[in-house]
Amino acid sequence: MFYMNCHRKGIVFIFIATVFLFISCEQRVDKDKLTITAVMDDIKQEFAPDKRVALFNIEYSRKGNETILKGESNLPEAVASFKQKLAGKNIYYLDSIQLLPSSNLNGFTQGLITISVANLRGRPAHSAELVTQATLGTPVKILKVEDSWYLIQTPDKYLSWVDSGGIMPL
């Protein structure tokens, strides 16, 4: 009886020790994630407090032991500051952050609105929320193209999507 009781306690001890081991290993990942998230929030607050006029969409993920930062921004200073702060905290990562304007625009980073009133959307879809409108001849900055939609920035700095029928890339 005494042997069984000790044996059972041993199994419980091993089980609890294993659980703590897994939790402690997971905390390292969470610590990096918390640090990256905190730095990301600081950068957003400093450089991109209004997502209607500044784009800083970076995501954190892990693949095995590798930290991956993926996303896009139209703010080179914000991305540089973000990378510098992470380096200062000794966080190493695979950099998949794309700076806009996108390189696949082949130099066509300016455009003109070509219809009397272009509806500018929050997402690249006709059913998306109407963000603002632009009138014929309005010059815009083209940041990227996705299917038949262009992500643009208007002269008043608003970011929005316009379909290809409403813009002429220059």
Tell what function each PLM region has.
Residues 1-8:
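N-terminal secretory signal peptides that target proteins for export/translocation
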Residues 8-16:
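Sec-dependent signal peptide recognition
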Residues 21-24:
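C-terminal motif of bacterial Sec signal peptides marking the signal peptidase cleavage site
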Residues 26-28:
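Bacterial signal peptide processing site
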Residues 30-63, 118:
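Gly/Ser-centered flexible loop/linker motifs
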Residues 66-68, 72, 79, 133-164:
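SH3/SH3-like beta-barrel superfamily modules
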Residues 76, 80-104, 125, 153-170:
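Boundary regions of SH3-family modules and the immediately adjacent low-complexity/disordered segments
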Residues 113-140:
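Beta-loop motif signature
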